[in-house]
Amino acid sequence: MFFITLIKWKQAPTKEIIDGTTKKLDDIKKQGIKFRVYWTLGRYDAVAIIEASTEKDAMNMLLAFQGMVDTETMVAVPREEAIKLL
């Protein structure tokens, strides 16, 4: 399953915060969850594209950052799969 997560920092990120999130992301990789994070300009500070087996796995990943960021997550269906549903 794929998920798109829009991210806003709750406070301006410092080197310590970034180091902490990097450690958490490294731990998440070891759990087999694939993701890419892009910092963005505009209303959101970053966007993450997550590939996880279940919604529960994706939610557990995001809960690791509770208190640090606000998120909005959407399930993403690959275009090819969505077209098959038409």
Predicted regions and their residues:
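Short S/T/G/P-rich N-terminal loop/turn motif that feeds into the first structured element of a domain
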Residues: 1-30, 34-35, 40-45, 77-86
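Short, well-ordered beta-strand segments in beta-rich or mixed alpha/beta enzyme
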Residues: 4-7, 41-63
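An amphipathic, aromatic/His-enriched active-site/gating alpha helix that lines ligand/cofactor pockets
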Residues: 52-83
